[in-house]
């Protein structure tokens, strides 16, 4: 999607950008990638398969996806990421940040994930936590919106209902985490 458009501009020979997609979006995503030569160095794989050959990838990044993976699927994707990364390879995560103590069902319905949960799953799958950043923090986000994170921009699921209020909050409060595969 959007991040693939950004990152594809920075991939040069012999590099490859591997874009992993869920099966639901695969056909439309492939069509988009085929429509522009800018995406010529983009390889598309399914999230439910091996992401890449073992120990072959320098870095993996995921933006605002963890809430879609909550449960066993998250373990599976983190495990596949660990296998694909070279020793010392990095795994960057940006995700809507839930308040500490938020339970799994509330995370699923709101789209916000606790930092503790993201870190726990990463550590359980062999990653080391290298760094955290507040670059995507938003203290205006109260995280108690009627349609969860999707109430805020860019989605604005309530359409014009309290639109000005939600636009003034801005995008969600997000955690930014950096993990590494041990050497």
Describe each PLM feature range.
Residues 1-51:
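Class I SAM-dependent methyltransferase SAM/SAH-binding core
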Residues 8-12, 75-88:
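A short glycine-rich, Lys/Arg-flanked "PGG" loop and its adjoining helix->strand segment in the class I
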Residues 58-75:
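A short SAM/SAH-binding and catalytic strip from SAM-dependent methyltransferases
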Residues 93-109:
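Short, glycine-/aromatic-enriched active-site segment of Class I SAM-dependent methyltransferases
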Residues 104-132:
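Conserved Class I S-adenosyl-L-methionine
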Residues 17-19, 88-97:
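Conserved beta-strand signature within the Rossmann-like core of class I S-adenosyl-L-methionine
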Residues 142-183:
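Core SAM-dependent methyltransferase catalytic element
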Residues 50-60:
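A short acidic, Gly/Pro-enriched loop at the edge of an enzyme's catalytic core
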